[in-house]
Amino acid sequence: MTPNPHIKNAKTAPVRNPGLFFLCAYFFAFFLFSCKSADFSSLSDSFNADSFAENFEWQRIDEGVYLYSSDSKNQYRIVKIDLSNPNIRITASPDNGEWQKAESVKMFAKHTDSLVAINTTPFYALNRLPFSKVKPAGLVIINKNKISEARANYCAFALFSAGGSFYGKIFDTQEECINNSPAPDYAFGGFWVILKDGEILPFKKYKDYRSAAGLANGGKTLFLLAGKNLTCYDCALILKSAGADNAMEFDGGSSSQMCINRKRMLMKFDRMPASILGIRICANQ
């Protein structure tokens, strides 16, 4: 999540009910896990990017959609999606770029009937309360409509329709994305490109929760990754090993989450994001 530098301190009315203790405990947990970078001192540190060698055994979860879960306490999950499948449908939020109530990735997956859903664009929040209104801090395009403006110096992931199916493309900047011809059907801002033409780009080795996207086969194969205790380099290495030749980072930290069949893949306290990408399979439609 991207903090809003113009936020004023929120004022809350006294709570006069027997559930005060539980409410306070809830807010304490929220501030502990969402208002600062996650503390990974108690998590597995078994991932070693320098000696990484993963044998990806994909599990089919639907037509053209495959899942792989790492062995080390499910440190990460990666989904491989065949975008050339004509039965794929894209779901996305939000429907406008104004301040609005956020929803969790799980809630989004449920009401859109998405097989796979993942958080995308970084965002602003009015305050640090769990149900604060939010809005995207970067590019969002849905059904060719620009929902949120581009943000300078940050990357973008886009989807284009062609011949009854989709293909994806990753852009170094969001301005490059909106100036592309043809115009994207869907686009989501992120932070940085981490893998370009098969080359892993250098980043500081800071571990956190991560959400990322990768592409292969001329954009026809999409990889979506969500994991814990990972650096940007780790994400790039995992996606490259899975077959991607280009990849980028979505919003990370407490906002990271991916749902498959409406089940959360990261077991943690979630900050509800402003923008979500979902994949549906609609056979015979």
Regions found by a protein language model. Name each.
Residues 5-21:
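Positively charged N-terminal leader segments that act as targeting/secretion signals
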Residues 35-285:
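Gly/Ser/Thr/Pro-rich low-complexity, intrinsically disordered segments
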